[in-house]
């Protein structure tokens, strides 16, 4: 079920489009769950994102055949070889919906607006096919909101969610005799949170998808996400932490006091610090004995730390 933003700066459900990073804890939990479920090697199978040419949907292509073609692109990308998607269109609140049956045939419904505006068909289908992928994995979060955030996060981190961010745009529209700006958005993450997950993906795979964005607003949100993700790499006890963070960390270590993102424990083997891996957010525990290089047991990211 993909959220659909109505014209006029409205988000799914009729509220204003939310900005910033209000769901960051859930996004990080989703990344951890994804790595735990499919492993670091499984994530590496998605090193290449869905290319824009594969989901281009020209106006002269048959509506239903084109939708089936784009759905097959997503099925192939998410490695669901035996899944068959049947795509239809109707008026509804959300951008899309999928019936999560036993398979192998799945029925996807898309909002009727995609009949005439085909730019975001790939984005909506990416989200719905990811629902099928997660259903087959048996991976879900309790509650609709958190489960949709999991779906958006997985779609984005595994290479198709840049389409969801690119669906965020502001355009001039004529209403009656007035010219006004209308905003469109897909998904449950904020634009900046989509950018954050894309930044995490870029760091993991060395991929730069910014040239693929058609939307200037999506590009700005991606850059905001890059900046926020960069902060994760400058948190103590990581070696790249700034002077202020290092100074506070040293003070907290002496007092064995919890700090922003880290905590200490003292035992027979000495003091150890626990903090989140900036890639998968699995907790890492290291001895407090100066500069060292650590490897996350879950995602295999190597980190320089000064504990």
Question: Which residue ranges define each predicted feature?
Answer:
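Pan-zinc metallopeptidase signature
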Residues: 2-25, 29, 180-307
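N-terminal alpha-helical scaffold/docking segments in eukaryotic complex subunits
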Residues: 2-58, 142
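Low-complexity, Gly/Pro
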Residues: 3-12, 58, 82-97, 163, ...
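Auxiliary, metal-adjacent structural segments of Zn-dependent hydrolase domains
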Residues: 36-103, 114-118
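Short pre-active-site segment immediately N-terminal to the catalytic Zn-binding motif
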Residues: 106-125, 143-146
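A structural motif
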Residues: 121-128, 161-166
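Active-site recognition of the HExxH zinc-binding catalytic motif
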Residues: 123-139
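Post-HExxH zinc-binding segment in Zn-dependent metallohydrolases
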Residues: 144-179
């Amino acid at each position: 079920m993909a959220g659909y933003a109505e014209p006029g700066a409205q988000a799914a459900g009729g509220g204003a489009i939310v900005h910033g990073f209000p769901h960051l804890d859930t996004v990080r939990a989703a990344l951890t769950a994804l790595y735990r479920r499919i492993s670091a090697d499984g994530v590496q199978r998605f090193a290449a994102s869905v290319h824009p040419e594969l989901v281009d949907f020209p106006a002269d292509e048959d509506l239903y055949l084109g939708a089936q073609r784009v759905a097959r692109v997503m099925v192939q990308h998410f490695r669901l070889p035996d899944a068959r998607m049947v795509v239809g269109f109707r008026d509804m609140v959300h951008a899309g919906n999928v019936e999560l049956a036993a398979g192998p045939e799945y029925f996807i419904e898309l909002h009727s607006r995609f009949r005439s505006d085909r730019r975001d068909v790939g984005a909506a289908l990416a989200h719905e096919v990811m629902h099928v992928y997660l259903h087959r994995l048996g991976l879900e979060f309790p509650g609709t909101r958190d489960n949709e955030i999991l779906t958006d996060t997985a779609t984005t981190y595994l290479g198709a969610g840049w389409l969801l961010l690119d669906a965020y745009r502001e355009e001039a529209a004529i209403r009656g005799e007035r010219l006004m700006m209308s905003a469109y958005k897909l998904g449950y993450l904020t634009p900046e949170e989509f950018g954050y997950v894309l930044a995490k993906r870029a760091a993991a795979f060395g991929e730069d998808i910014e040239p693929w964005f058609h939307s200037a607003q999506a590009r700005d949100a991606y850059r905001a996400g890059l900046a926020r993700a960069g902060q994760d790499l400058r948190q103590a006890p990581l070696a790249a932490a700034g002077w202020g963070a290092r100074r506070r960390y040293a003070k907290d270590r002496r007092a064995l006091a919890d700090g922003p993102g880290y905590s200490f424990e003292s035992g027979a083997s000495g003091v150890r610090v626990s903090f989140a891996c900036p890639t998968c957010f699995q907790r890492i525990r290291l001895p407090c004995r100066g500069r060292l290089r650590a490897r996350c047991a879950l995602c295999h990211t190597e980190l320089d730390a000064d504990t």
